[in-house]
């Protein structure tokens, strides 16, 4: 009984201490506000127009993600283009992301920012890049084959060791005199 009472008093003390440390109106600042969350998927033309106005878009340009249960709601489906493709000389409100205030951001903006995926068209077409890559790899494989088939080593003499060609270390009889080895000097 005394242990239960001590436990209850300890819990009450912790609750009072926590109430004194953190004010009741405090919350974490990382949550998305209710205004930032997408609304329900628009079913009527009036709802579509209201959603387009909410995201500062024209009704003709507004197209929501398909209602397949992923939770995109009325968020607009923007083209899959990276921020790198946008004009670098324009006076953006947020120049690092190349965005203006009130402009809808791509749902996967973290994937399309400038230091990640670059979807801009390449100056050389894909087929030519592949031809150059595979041509280089084929040439290098051919050169490796030639080098393996026709080796070109520097001519060397036989390996020379000190102490009568390591006679004892190579298992020679210590009682016998080793045969003399001629060492060549350069």
Swiss-Prot record:
UniProt similarity note: Belongs to the complex I NDUFB8 subunit family.
GO biological process terms, semicolon-separated: mitochondrial electron transport, NADH to ubiquinone
Species, as recorded: Bos taurus
Keyword DNA repair set for record: no
Function statement: Accessory subunit of the mitochondrial membrane respiratory chain NADH dehydrogenase (Complex I), that is believed not to be involved in catalysis. Complex I functions in the transfer of electrons from NADH to the respiratory chain. The immediate electron acceptor for the enzyme is believed to be ubiquinone.
UniProt subunit comment: Complex I is composed of 45 different subunits.
Pfam families linked to this entry: NDUF_B8
Transit peptide: 1-28
Residues annotated as transmembrane: 133-153
GO cellular component annotations of the record: mitochondrial inner membrane; respiratory chain complex I
Protein's name in the database: NADH dehydrogenase [ubiquinone] 1 beta subcomplex subunit 8, mitochondrial
Keywords per UniProt: Electron transport, Membrane, Mitochondrion, Mitochondrion inner membrane, Respiratory chain, Transit peptide, Transmembrane, Transmembrane helix, Transport
Compartments in which it is found: Mitochondrion inner membrane
Topology relative to the membrane: Single-pass membrane protein
Domain of life where this protein originates: Eukaryota
InterPro entries associated with the record: NDUFB8 (IPR008699), Ndufb8_metazoa (IPR016551)
